[in-house]
C-alpha cells in the first residue's frame, strides 16, 4: 500500500513539472519578440515617393552631418533656386546642389564665410548691386533698380550659369522682385506672380511698390538667346 501511495504522489509532481515546462515556452517566445522590437528601434524609416506611390523606406544610418537649407530656400525651376543669405550651417546643403553660380542682391558684400565658401568650391559669386549710384547715406537694402534686375535676369536666362542660386538678406523682397520679373517673362499672370511673391514675405506681407515694379517691368528688355537658354524657359515661351 505504501508503494502505491508513493506512485500516486509522484503523478502530481510530474504534472507540475510538465506544467512549468509548458509555461516557460511562451515566456521565451515573448523575450524573443521583445528582442526583435528592440532591434527595430535601432532602425530609421523615412517616407519616400516611388513609382508605385509613397512607401516606407529603411535607412540604415542617420546622416553624419546636418543638412539644413538656407532661410526661405525654394526651388524655382530646374537647377534654379532662391533663398536668404546662406550661413555656414547651410554649406553642406549647398554642396549637394553642385552650384555653379550664386547671385547676391545687395550693395553690401555678403558674410566672409560665404565668400570663402564660394572661393573654396569655385562657385561664381555674382554681385548684383541694387543701386550702383547709391551714396553713403542711402539705405543699402532699398529695392532693385530696373538696370540691376535686367543684369540678373540675363544671367538667369543663360544655361551655362547653372545650377544657380539667387539670394538676398532674407530671401524675400529683392529675391522676390527678380523671380517675379522672371515669371512675367515666362508668361505668368499677375495674380499668380503676386501669390508666389507673398508666400515668402512672412506675416508682414508684401510691399506694394515691389508688386508695382514687377507689373510695370518691360520683359522685352531681357534678351534671350534660344541656343543658350534653359529648356524650361524655352518650354514656357512656346
From Swiss-Prot:
Q: Which residues form the signal peptide?
A: none
Q: Chief subcellular site?
A: cytoplasm
Print the keywords alphabetically: Acetylation, Cytoplasm, Hydrolase, Phosphoprotein, Protein phosphatase, Stress response
Q: Which residues carry this modification: Phosphoserine?
A: 24
Q: Which positions carry N-acetylthreonine?
A: 2
What does the record give as the active site? 168 (phosphocysteine intermediate)
Q: Where's it found, cell-wise?
A: Cytoplasm
Q: What's the superkingdom here?
A: Eukaryota
Q: What does this protein do?
A: Putative tyrosine-protein phosphatase required for protection against superoxide stress. Involved in cell-cycle delay in response to linoleic acid hydroperoxide (LoaOOH).
**What is the recorded name of this protein?**
Putative tyrosine-protein phosphatase OCA1
Where is the organism placed in the taxonomic lineage, from the top?
Answer: Eukaryota, Fungi, Dikarya, Ascomycota, Saccharomycotina
Q: Which gene encodes it?
A: OCA1
